[in-house]
Amino acid sequence: LGLINTEGNLEVLGLDPRKDRHKLLKEVCYITDVAVLPKWMTVNQVLQYVDGVHPSFNLEKCLTILSRTNIKRSSKVRVLSRGMMVQLHLSIVMAIDAKLLVLDEPTLGLDLVYRKEFYSQLIEDYYDGDKTILISTHQVEEIEGVLSDAVFMNQGRVVLHDSIESINKKFLELRPNQDFIEKAKSLRPIHQRLELGREVLLFEDTEIDKLSNLGEVRPPFIADLFMAIMDKTKKEIEA
């Protein structure tokens, strides 16, 4: 999938991607941030082609997914809008029975309605307990509701890797009441920011009982946690 070997070892589904690429690609589906489809073909020709070359492609399922869009099967790929191109590509990918689905900025080019519909379809039409979906995206807030695990990376280095369940237990966000701001800060938050003029403090491995009397406590949104971890990592590098 374009990864460059620098150090260490890598296995995907128990296979070495460098030695067992042919076997691996039978079990892996991948969509990049740019949908590349033959522009001279019609939509129907693309579907027939994929049906002929990929043994795990389910044409009927693809047509069902495609029927929820405004894409006509008689249309040439070259006349499709960017959003339609992505929808067509995703319809094909989601109709392939693969154990691992890798999505790189999958909703790039789609408007808000289609982005929400896509993730809803992803869970309803593709995911089951035997499949894994790996999503690489900068639009963190869009995928929070479908995540089971999260990996934050900064300049090629993993700075956080944990389950969402564990993250929600480990990190807490406090909006302290005005009278308790200084007391809250004395508990050593790992990050703080202003939101509409109000202090928001992020704590790691701090008991909720120590915070609950100081203001409003809740697990942070993934996007807010991401920004906080990136800022914290940057300061550590610069120190």
Over which residues does each language-model region extend?
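Short, surface-exposed beta-strand/loop "edge" segments at domain boundaries and coil↔beta transitions
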Residues: L101-P106, F180-A184, E207-S212
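Alpha-helix N-cap/helix-start and coil->helix boundary motif
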Residues: N44, V140, I181, I222-A223
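ABC transporter nucleotide-binding domain
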Residues: E117-F203
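Residue-level marker of positions within ordered structural domains that often coincide
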Residues: P55, A95, D179, M227, ...
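C-terminal coupling/interaction segments
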Residues: H191-A239
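ABC transporter nucleotide-binding domains
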Residues: L1-E141, G145-S148, N154
